[in-house]
Amino acid sequence: MAEASIQIEVVYATVQRQVLMTVDVPAGSSVRQALALCGMDREFPELDLSHCPVGIFGKVVADPAARVLEAGERIEIYRPLLADPMEIRRLRAAKAREKRTLPG
């Protein structure tokens, strides 16, 4: 008898390209197992799926190896930030202060 499977989605995006895959995985699969099966690392060879932060419908999954998937869920693979958000805000505030103090 065939093992029951569920259908999930896996999504990843870069600046240049977005990919959404629909994948059948065995029922009871963890997020980590589904990532190993999905093939996203073949689409994006630079992607290290064992260390990427992931989420399901916008909520970060703390332990992808323990989180069991349900049918219809979407795994989102997150990219690292290119810049520190606090530093960006600091620079933006400094630039705004500069504009206010320049004679105009």
Swiss-Prot record:
Family matches, as SUPFAM superfamilies: MoaD/ThiS
Gene3D superfamilies: RnfH-like
Transmembrane domains' residue ranges: none
Stored InterPro entries: Mopterin_synth/thiamin_S_b, RnfH, RnfH_sf
Record-stated family: Belongs to the UPF0125 (RnfH) family.
The protein, known as: UPF0125 protein PSPTO_4512
